[in-house]
C-alpha cells in the first residue's frame, strides 16, 4: 500500500500544538501515558484470549519493553498487546471520536501542574509524546491479523499511514525521535528511573533493554498492587498507584484496601480523591473503578460496580467468584456483582461516617467537593436512605457551620419534632430570608440547602429517624407554637384569623388571582410579608427549577402571609378599621416585594417601578 497522508482533526491539531510548544515542567509524564496505554493493550488482549485463545498462540506471556537508542536518538516502547490495524491507527491516533479533546481544551487552566493531570484524564495521553519528540513512529500489528501498518507524524497538522513489509510480531511499537534539547531522556539511568517511578504497580512485566549488555532487565515487580498484603505496601506506593490510575496530581484523601472473604470473595483497593474531579457532573462522566476477575482486567465501562452517587471513587475491584469468560453484557444484571456493589457501598459509607466524626474539617472539604454527587443517592429507590443521610452535612443557619442531621436533632428545642430547611442558590441570601427570621428568633435552627439535588431528595425523604423534614416556606409553620401541642396551636390560629379577617380579605380583593390565599403569618417577626405554599404544594424553588427546565409551563399562585406586627401592615389594618381603603398600590408593592425576595418574577415590572417611585417621592416631599 502506498503512503496515505491525512490531516489531523482540528481539535487534535490544537492538542499537538500545545504539546509541541509545551511549557510543562514535568515532561516525563509521556512515559506514564505510553506505559499505561501499553498495559491497557495487554489487558484487552488478555481478556479477549479467554474466549479466543488463538489470538495469543505462541506468545501468551505479556510484556512491555523500553529501550533507549542513543545512536539513533530514539526512545522505543514496545508491547505485545492487542495491536492496531490501519483503521484503528486512524481512529485512535488521527482523530478523536469522543468529546475528550474538546473537553480537555475547555478545562485547561494555565496551571501546568493541573494541566498535566488533564492530559491523561481526557484520553489524549499519546500526544504527550510530542513534548519530547519531534517525530513519532508507531508500528503495529493487530492480534489475529497478518498486516503490519506504520503511523508517522511530526505533529505539524498531518500524519502518514502506510503498510510495512517488516517482520513484526503482534503488538505495538512506539519510536520517539527525541528533540535535541530533550536528549537527557536518552540517558539509560534516567530512563530506568522514570519507568520505575511510573510502573511498579503495573501488572504487566516491564523490561529495559540495555543495548550495551544486549539483555533485558525487569524494572517492576509485575504483581498487581492490590494482591499484596497491606503491610508490604508503603504509603508512597499507594499514592503512586492512585495517581497513575486516576491521572491525578493530588494525594488520595482516603485509601481503602480490603479483602472480602466468605460467601463472596473479592479484593478492593479504592481511593477517595482529596480534590474535586473534573467530570463529576459531566453528562459523559465515567465511573473510574476497574473490574478485574482473577487479576484479568475486564472493564471499567458500562458495569454497575459502584452506584452512580459514588462515582468519585477511584480504584480496582478484583473478584474471585465471577467466571473469566463472562460477557460484558452478562455483567449488567449479575447477582455476584450486585453483592459486591452492596458490600463496597456499605464499606464506603461506613468509612465516610467515621471520617465525619473523627475529622470534621477534612470532611467539610470532602463534602464541598463531592456532597452534591453523594446526595443524588437519596433520589434512588435502591439506596439505604437513612445510612446515606447519616453521612450528609448541611449549613446551619443558627450556627453558621456544617452539621449533620443527628447534630441538628440534638439541638432540638423542648417539644420540637421537625427538621426545618430552606433551599436557594446562595446561603448568604437565605440567611436574610423572611421565611426563617421567626424560627431563628426562637433559636430554632434551619438547614440551608443550596444544591439543586436538595429539592429532589427532600421530596422522597420526608422524614429522618421519625422526625419530619419540612421546608420553612410552608404556610402552617407557627414559630410560637413550634414546640407546643397542636391543640393549643389550632386555638390561636382561629383567634388570629378572625381578628384580622378584614385585613386578609382586603389583600385578596386587591391582588385577586395573583394569590392563592392570604393568611396571617405565624413565622414572621419583622418583615411585612412573605410568600408561602401549602403542605401539599410543590416547594417554591423546585417549581422554579422545573419551569426553567420547561417541565411545567407556569408558576402556581402562592399564599401571601402577612405580619400584623409590622408597622406597614399595622397601618393598612388601622386604615381599614377607619374605613379607609386607599392602600391598593401599597398592597401591590408589598406583594411584589415578597415575590422579589423569593426569587419569583414580578407580574408587571413597569407598574412596580412606578409604585416604588411614587412612595419614595411622597416620603421626601
Swiss-Prot record:
Residues 329-544 are annotated as: B. Signal peptide: none annotated. It is found in: Cytoplasm. GO terms for cellular component: cytoplasm. Belongs to the heat shock protein 90 family. The gene is htpG. The keyword Cytoplasm applies. Residues 478-498 are annotated as: Disordered. Residues 545-621 are annotated as: C. NCBIfam families: PRK05218.1 (NF003555). InterPro entries: HATPase_C_sf, Heat_shock_protein_90_CS, HSP90_C, Hsp90_fam, Hsp90_N, Ribosomal_Su5_D2-typ_SF. Residues 1-328 are annotated as: A. Its main location: cytoplasm. This is Chaperone protein HtpG. Homodimer. One of its GO terms (molecular function) is unfolded protein binding. It comes from Rickettsia bellii (strain RML369-C). Molecular chaperone. Has ATPase activity. It comes from the Bacteria. Residues 486-498 have a biased composition (Basic and acidic residues). Keywords: ATP-binding, Chaperone, Cytoplasm, Nucleotide-binding, Stress response.
Amino acid at each position: 500500500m502506498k503512503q496515505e497522508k491525512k490531516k489531523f482533526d482540528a481539535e487534535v491539531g490544537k492538542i499537538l500544538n500545545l504539546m509541541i510548544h509545551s511549557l510543562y515542567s514535568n515532561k516525563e509524564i509521556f512515559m506514564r501515558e505510553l506505559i499505561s496505554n501499553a498495559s491497557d493493550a495487554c489487558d484487552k488482549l488478555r481478556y479477549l484470549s479467554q474466549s479466543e485463545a488463538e489470538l495469543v498462540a505462541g506468545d501468551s506471556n505479556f510484556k512491555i519493553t523500553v529501550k533507549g537508542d542513543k545512536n539513533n536518538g530514539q526512545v522505543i516502547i514496545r508491547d505485545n498487546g492487542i495491536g492496531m490495524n490501519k483503521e484503528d491507527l486512524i481512529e485512535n491516533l488521527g482523530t478523536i471520536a469522543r468529546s475528550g479533546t474538546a473537553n480537555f481544551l475547555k478545562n485547561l487552566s494555565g496551571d501546568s501542574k493541573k494541566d498535566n493531570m488533564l492530559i491523561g484524564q481526557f484520553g489524549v495521553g499519546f500526544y504527550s509524546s510530542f513534548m519530547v519528540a519531534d517525530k513519532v513512529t508507531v508500528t503495529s500489528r493487530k492480534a489475529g491479523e497478518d498486516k503490519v501498518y506504520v503511523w508517522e507524524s511530526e505533529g505539524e497538522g498531518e500524519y502518514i499511514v502506510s503498510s510495512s513489509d517488516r517482520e513484526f510480531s503482534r503488538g505495538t511499537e512506539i519510536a520517539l525521535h527525541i528533540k535535541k534539547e530533550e536528549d537527557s531522556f536518552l540517558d539509560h539511568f534516567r530512563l530506568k528511573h522514570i519507568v520505575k517511578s511510573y510502573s511498579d504497580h503495573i501488572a504487566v512485566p516491564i523490561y529495559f533493554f540495555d543495548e550495551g549488555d544486549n539483555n533485558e532487565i525487569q524494572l517492576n515487580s509485575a504483581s498487581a498492587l492490590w494482591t499484596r498484603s497491606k503491610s508490604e505496601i508503603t504509603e508512597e506506593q499507594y499514592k503512586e498507584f492512585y495517581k497513575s490510575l486516576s491521572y491525578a496530581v493530588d494525594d488520595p484523601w482516603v485509601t481503602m484496601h480490603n479483602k472480602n472473604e466468605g460467601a463472596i470473595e473479592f479484593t478492593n483497593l479504592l481511593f477517595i480523591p482529596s480534590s474535586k474531579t473534573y467530570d463529576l457532573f459531566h453528562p459523559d462522566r465515567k465511573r473510574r473503578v476497574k473490574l478485574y476477575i482473577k487479576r484479568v482486567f475486564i472493564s471499567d465501562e458500562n458495569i454497575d460496580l459502584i452506584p452512580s452517587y459514588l462515582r468519585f471513587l477511584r480504584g480496582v475491584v478484583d473478584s474471585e467468584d465471577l467466571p473469566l469468560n463472562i460477557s460484558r453484557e452478562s455483567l449488567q444484571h449479575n447477582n455476584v456483582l450486585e453483592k459486591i456493589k452492596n458490600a463496597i457501598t456499605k464499606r464506603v459509607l461506613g468509612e465516610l461516617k467515621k471520617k465525619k466524626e473523627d475529622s470534621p474539617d477534612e470532611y467539610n472539604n470532602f463534602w464541598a467537593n463531592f456532597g452534591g454527587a453523594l446526595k443524588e443517592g437519596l433520589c434512588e429507590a435502591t439506596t439505604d436512605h437513612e445510612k446515606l443521610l447519616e453521612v450528609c452535612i448541611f449549613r446551619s443557619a443558627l450556627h453558621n457551620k456544617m452539621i449533620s442531621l443527628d447534630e441538628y436533632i440534638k439541638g432540638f428545642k423542648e417539644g420540637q419534632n421537625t427538621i426545618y430547611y430552606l433551599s436557594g442558590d446562595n446561603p448568604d441570601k437565605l440567611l436574610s430570608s423572611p421565611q426563617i427570621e421567626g424560627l431563628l428568633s426562637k433559636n430554632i435552627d434551619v438547614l440551608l440547602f443550596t444544591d439543586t439535588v436538595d429539592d429532589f431528595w427532600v421530596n422522597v425523604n420526608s422524614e429522618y429517624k421519625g422526625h419530619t423534614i419540612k421546608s420553612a416556606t410552608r404556610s402552617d409553620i407557627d414559630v410560637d407554637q413550634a414546640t407546643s401541642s397542636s391543640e393549643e396551636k389550632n386555638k390561636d390560629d382561629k383567634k388570629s384569623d378572625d381578628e384580622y379577617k378584614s385585613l386578609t380579605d382586603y389583600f385578596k380583593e386587591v391582588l385577586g388571582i395573583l394569590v392563592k390565599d392570604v393568611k396571617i403569618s405565624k413565622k414572621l417577626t419583622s418583615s411585612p410579608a412573605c410568600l408561602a405554599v401549602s403542605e401539599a404544594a410543590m416547594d417554591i424553588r423546585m417549581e422554579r427549577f422545573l419551569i426553567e427546565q420547561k417541565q411545567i409551563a407556569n408558576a402556581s399562585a402562592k399564599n401571601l402571609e402577612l405580619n400584623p406586627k409590622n408597622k406597614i401592615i399595622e397601618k393598612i389594618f388601622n386604615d381599614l378599621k377607619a374605613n379607609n381603603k386607599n392602600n391598593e398600590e401599597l398592597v401591590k408593592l408589598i406583594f411584589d416585594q415578597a415575590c422579589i425576595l423569593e426569587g419569583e418574577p414580578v407580574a408587571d415590572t413597569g407598574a412596580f417601578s412606578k409604585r416604588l417611585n411614587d412612595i419614595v417621592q411622597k416620603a421626601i416631599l
